[in-house]
Every structure is written in structure tokens, then in C-alpha cells.
């Protein structure tokens, strides 16, 4: 490992972070750390098309580059990535640490490239991350590149990109429920009927309930609303910025292990993540000023009362 990675104001950094949304949000701390450590450096982010627009709004990067993560047999895309990685970067910080980015180091990077990551043979290897939260993993990597570890993660860049909840004429106070998550892992979903029961209990305490999700979550969100018809259904109707603005003003947010819940925690909203056996809280618990998690094996074992008990520790409006 290099004794020091002090980078001059004229040097160039490349940060690799592909996604998904939760992974991007957990990287905010590392992004801020690198920018605070190198306030005048040129810092580029390599990410996927899905997050290029969001990354372009971030205050930490001078340039956003797109990686389509094409198969290796796509010669044109592979050569494009090779040309990119062969540019005179002073340091490449791999925050994805995937098999794909390991191949990037092994086959595409310059032989003498300074590379922070977990791939064998890189110049600045991260320590063993077994049992370490994903947020902290990226903070450690940023620290190896002389990031400022106590840098403030200012979310105004995202929150100011959307109208406040009052401008949307939403009732207050309100709770946000996130009933969806990856369709590939239904075992990570708390049952829709339990979300509906939670919504009804919250409404009985004079809290409005707002349901959110992507278009892919529409079926489960609609099912929740059918059983808790007083809920407001905003599924598929919010941008990431609008979702963040909705979350930050919420009395509480409850949802599965999915990107919007990490976003809620990052805004400082009182947040509860519901976990099943596929989620290891040591590695994947959300980070934020007021967040918690509760796990069931299977997730269907989690009771509505269990969730309400956790909420009572985060907000005064749930009794």
C-alpha cells in the first residue's frame, strides 16, 4: 500500500459506483468524503445509465461517465471502457468492488494504475470487510484515497430539486410506506396485507399514509391501497428528488430492503427497514440520524405490533 495518496489540485480521480439506488445512496458519505478531501481536484463518477441523471445533480462530481455494463463479448463497449480506464487518472476508487470491476482492473486498467478496492493485486487494497456495513466499507475506501471521513453529507442539492410536501397539498402529518422491492426477491417483501393493517393503525392515530414505489411495484401498492383505501397512492408518480422531499417531511417511513428506504434514512426521516433472511443488518442496515431495522425469519413473521413498537422509539406521533 502507498504510504500516502496526497493528491494535488490538478490531479484526476475516477470513482466507480454502478448502483442500485440503495447502493448509490449508501455511497453519498464516501462521495462527500472524497470531495471534501480534494476540493479542487477533477472527480469523475462512472455509473450506470439509470443513475446518470441523479449523479449529474450531485455536488461532488465534475463529470458523470456512463457504463452500460455490456457483456464482455461486446467488443465495442469493452474497448470503450478500456480507453476510459487507460486515461491518466491519478487514482481510481472502486466503490462497487464487484466481479465486473475486478475484471476492469485485471484487463483494462493501466499496469501502474493506483487503484483503491478489494481486487487482488491493486495498489491500495481495502481491509477485510466481512461483517462491515456497506456505507462504512465505502467510507474506508474513501479514506484510503485521503477523503475527509467526517465530511458533512449535505442533501440540499437533492431536496431543493423538488417541491416541498406542502406545495403538493398533501395532508400532514403523514407516514410513508414502501411496500415494494426487487421482483426477483419476493422473500424480501413484508406481506401487502400487513402493510395495509399498518396503514390502518397509523391512520387511526391521525396520520395520513402515503404509498410509494416504482412502476414495477404498482401491483403490490395497489393491493395495499385496496385494503387501506384512505391511503394516498403515489406509486410511479415521483422522481427521486420528489421522493426525497416527500421523505424528509414525513413523520415516519416504513419499508422493505429497497432503495427508497435507504434514501429516507439519508434524509434524516425517522425510518424503519423491514428485513427478511436475505438481508444481513450488519452489512445492509440503513444509515441515518434516525433509523432502525427489524428482522423476521421469514419476513412474514414480523407483526404489525412489532413495527409500531419500533416506530414509538422514533416518533412522538405513534403511541
Regions found by a protein language model. Name each.
Residues 1-319:
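Catalytic machinery of carbohydrate-active enzymes
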